[in-house]
Amino acid sequence: MPEPRKITFASLDAAILEAEQLLGSGYEKAGNWNFGQVCGHLENWLSYPMDGFPKVDSPADSAADPEAAEAGKAMLQDILDNGFPLGVPTNPDTIPAEDSVSDQAALSRLREVVQRFSAYEGEIADSPFFGVMDKQAVLSLQLRHFAHHLGFLIPK
């Protein structure tokens, strides 16, 4: 299995362009998820700051615990500086079943949530991991998240 790519994105539009290129060229997996699963997972996590987060097992409840809030801020800064670490499990409910949606449909849904986020002017829901975030912080985190997961798909 190939190693994941180390990529970065300056915008969500650039990430969508990368996804479109992967869909067009084909890809090799450097991890466990296929294209549709990656797109679906990214769609889910980009929608949560707008629609509210699901209940997750978090080592930190930043709303109730000041120490957890500080730990969440430190973890966020580390991700923004260095990217997402490999091997950290995610909520399995945020990963679509392997063949639950076509690659084209998954990309279309991801594109729609990117457009919705870009135009969004409402309140940002508090993150169960990082606490209160503004839209710019969410965008910065999501750019790292998109790079992390799209990096596991290697263009052919």
Locate each region found by the language model:
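Extreme N-terminal tail/first-helix region
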Residues: 1-20
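Short, charged, low-complexity loops and linkers
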Residues: 1-4, 25, 92-98
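Generic, ordered loop/turn and secondary-structure boundary motif
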Residues: 8, 34, 85, 96, ...
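Amphipathic alpha-helix face/heptad-repeat signature
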Residues: 8-11, 106, 142
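Short, contiguous alpha-helical
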Residues: 24-80, 116, 120-156
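Acidic/histidine-rich alpha-helical segments that form the ligand environment
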Residues: 74-125
